Amino acid sequence: MPRRSRGSRQTILVIEDDPVARADLQARLKAQGYTVALAADAASALTVVNRERPDLILLDLGLPAGDGFLVLERLRKIEVLAAIPVLIITGRSDAETRKRVDAMGLAPVLAKPVSTEVLLAAIRSALETPPG
């Protein structure tokens, strides 16, 4: 998926079920000039990603009605969506979660709570890295 030109605002989809965390991420990203789309669960996430075609997805793994891994699996099955970079942001730190994340080639995993500096560095890196 081609990146938007430097003159246009990049869109980040925040998929987070906790309304406080979702609003916090939205505020921090908007303050940096990003356009922010929001989803609170797996079903709405897939609808929003199809509609918005974001430049990057921030994905919480602990979602109601299908976890973040389900969202990832569905995204990767749709060619035009599979190239969208995904950053995992999660409070999970168990070995099974780490194993699944590693197997999917997802890095870095941003541990909650994530500082603005770490968040923005990860976003910039992901947006500058060519797909594939």
Language model feature labels by segment:
Residues 41, 67-73:
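Acidic catalytic/metal-coordinating carboxylates
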Residues 52-58, 63:
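Active-site beta3 strand of CheY-like receiver
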Residues 19-37, 104, 116:
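Two-component/phosphorelay signaling modules centered on CheY-like receiver
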Residues 70, 93-110, 121:
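Alpha4 helix (beta4-alpha4-beta5 surface) of REC/receiver domains from two-component response regulators
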Residues 64, 82, 94, 113:
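The feature encodes the CheY-like receiver
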Residues 1-13, 117-132:
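Non-catalytic signal-transmission and effector/linker regions of two-component phosphorelay proteins
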Residues 16:
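Conserved acidic carboxylate
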